[in-house]
């Protein structure tokens, strides 16, 4: 059967018996010589473990950096006299890390994973060191952008490398460790960030600067381990053309769209700035599609990948769930800090159930996938669970008990664990080995784009609604005797001044730090306003994520192979 297929492909007709035999012998000889190479495409467990430590160290850098900086950014802004510019430090990092994700994927398919991963870690270390000694918010934004150039490759390349050295059936177990790293960083980030911010100085260096300096030793350790241990079997250097036009058009297309997603609430979604960003972004992305169609297999994102049903459907699931679940996820720490009155450090600890849920979901899905070779059920269960928990989060109010928040956070985490890992495995199993890097990076890119747009849109909805909800809550409190009593208490004079400033428009909800020390009775209408606005966002998130259930159900359930049947890595 194999011989007939080869011959039919080659369109050989009217061949003599001796030609068939000669060709058959050559095929058999080729197969016998290459059987050992195919079997050795993947590494043994004892070889994988040290590599895994290096990959996880690099991944931990990127994951920790996002949460630790989020905790410290207000203090950093105050110290650098640029609190109003703090968003740019985050936006710059987000833009560069997002636009470089697909570039790392494609370039690693051409030049190899190891040199690109080492390059990514090195850039991240340099960016971290520069950020630690920033003298203004403008310079910090530039240095954070450099950090993002490295961060864009850390997660994508780590997943792609696992795809190179681990057979499809076993990938879920190892990739589960990566999900655990992200979960752990979400807890450690606020705790470590809170510790450094709370120090006036350490070894003569301002406390918040250690938020970035701590990345340097971790990065150097990861660099050493990866440099010494990472070896991908059957490495072959192949000459490929680099898709420069595709890279430029993608970059020019994504930057304005990401920028308007972050700043649209401030500019106004129909402002001149926003419309300009829309126009440049859409035109550039249209050009990107044209260039990619011309470049064929050399494209950064080969359009033929979308002909694969699994890749297309998982990409859609990634965008939708990225928007819904990460947009909804952004509400949890805000709820705990604004409505619950928790400090950033305490809020990080209160999100521990979410982390445990992610780890539980990843471990369960990883073991079952490894045992059965089937993955489809988990994205389906995960999207259903995410939808259900987001819907149940609409029950949150200003007086919700923490145990209920913890339960729903845990279930939300389980849903995340069931979606994040299996979707990557599904795509890696669907594409040829030569497309492993670009396919993995594409899934990550679509999820990041969804998360960026979703988070920005949900926060915009939150702050667009909170004013009206708070006003309604204040009107309902006018007849409350306890509220009137607190209003007349001279000890609450500063809180009353803040409330009056809000009502007259002299203050906004951009700074809510004063709520932590304010009288609880007086600010209860504000807490109600935020809680009601957040539940509205949770409802929208549930509706958005529910759409992904259909695409998860339609995703093919291809069985994962024991040793892999793809061609050896050729990069």
Predicted segments — roles?
Residues 41-42, 224-251, 294-309:
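Flexible interhelical linker loops that connect adjacent transmembrane helices
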Residues 46-100, 141-142, 259, 270-438, ...:
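Transmembrane core module of solute transporters
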Residues 108-245, 272, 356:
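Helix-loop-helix hairpins in multi-pass membrane proteins, especially solute transporters
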Residues 130-132, 147, 392-393, 412, ...:
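MFS-fold secondary transporters
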Residues 175-184, 188, 328, 405-491, ...:
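Small-residue-rich alpha-helical segments with characteristic i,i+4
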């Amino acid at each position: 059967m194999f011989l007939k297929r080869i011959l039919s492909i080659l369109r050989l007709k009217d061949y003599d018996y001796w030609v068939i035999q000669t060709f058959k012998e050559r095929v058999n000889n080729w197969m016998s010589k290459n059987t050992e190479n195919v079997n050795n495409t993947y590494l043994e467990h004892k070889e994988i473990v040290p590599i895994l430590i290096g990959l996880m160290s690099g991944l931990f850098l990127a994951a920790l950096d996002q949460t630790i900086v989020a905790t410290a950014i207000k203090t950093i802004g105050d110290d650098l006299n640029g609190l109003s510019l703090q968003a740019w430090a985050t936006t710059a990092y987000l833009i560069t890390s997002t636009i470089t994700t697909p570039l790392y994927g494609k370039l690693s398919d051409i030049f190899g994973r190891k040199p690109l991963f080492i390059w990514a870690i090195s850039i991240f270390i340099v960016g971290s060191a520069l950020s630690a000694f920033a003298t203004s918010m403008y310079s910090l934004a530039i240095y954070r952008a450099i950090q993002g150039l490295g961060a864009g490759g850390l997660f994508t390349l780590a997943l792609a490398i696992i795809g190179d050295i681990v057979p499809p059936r076993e990938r879920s177990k190892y990739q589960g460790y990566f999900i655990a790293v992200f979960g752990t960083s979400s807890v450690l980030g606020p705790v470590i960030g809170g510790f450094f911010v709370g120090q006036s100085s350490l070894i003569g260096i301002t406390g918040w600067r250690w938020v970035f300096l701590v990345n340097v030793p971790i990065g150097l350790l990861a660099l050493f381990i990866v440099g010494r241990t990472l070896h991908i079997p059957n490495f072959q250097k192949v000459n490929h053309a680099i898709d420069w036009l595709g890279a430029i058009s993608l970059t020019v297309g994504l930057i304005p769209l990401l920028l308007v997603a972050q700043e649209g609430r401030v500019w106004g979604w129909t402002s001149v700035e926003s419309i300009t960003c829309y126009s440049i972004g859409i035109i550039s992305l249209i050009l990107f599609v044209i260039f990619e169609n011309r470049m064929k297999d050399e494209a950064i994102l080969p359009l033929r990948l979308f002909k694969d049903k699994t890749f297309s459907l998982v990409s859609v699931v990634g965008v939708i769930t990225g928007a819904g679940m990460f947009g909804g996820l952004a509400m949890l720490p805000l709820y705990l800090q604004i409505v619950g009155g928790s400090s950033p450090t305490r809020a990080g600890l209160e999100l521990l159930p979410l982390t445990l849920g992610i780890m539980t979901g990843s471990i369960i899905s990883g073991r079952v996938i490894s045992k059965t070779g089937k993955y489809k059920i988990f994205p389906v269960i995960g999207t259903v669970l995410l939808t259900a928990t987001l819907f149940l989060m609409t029950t949150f109010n200003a007086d919700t008990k923490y145990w209920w928040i913890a339960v729903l956070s845990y279930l939300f985490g389980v849903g995340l664990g069931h979606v994040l890992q299996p979707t990557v495995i599904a795509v890696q199993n669907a594409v040829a080995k030569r497309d492993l890097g670009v396919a993995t990076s594409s899934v990550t890119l679509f999820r990041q784009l969804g998360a960026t747009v979703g988070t920005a849109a949900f926060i915009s909805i939150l702050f667009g609604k909170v004013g009206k909800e708070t006003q309604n809550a204040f009107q309902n409190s006018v007849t409350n005797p306890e509220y009137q009593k607190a209003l007349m208490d001279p000890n609450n004079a500063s809180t009353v001044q803040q409330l009056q400033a809000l009502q007259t428009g002299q203050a906004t909800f951009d700074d809510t730090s004063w709520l932590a020390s304010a009288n609880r009775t007086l600010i209860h209408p504000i807490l109600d306003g935020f809680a009601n606005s957040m539940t509205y966002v949770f409802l929208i998130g549930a509706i958005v994520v529910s759409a992904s259930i259909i695409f998860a159900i339609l995703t093919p359930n291809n069985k994962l192979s024991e040793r892999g049947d793809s061609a050896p890595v050729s990069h």
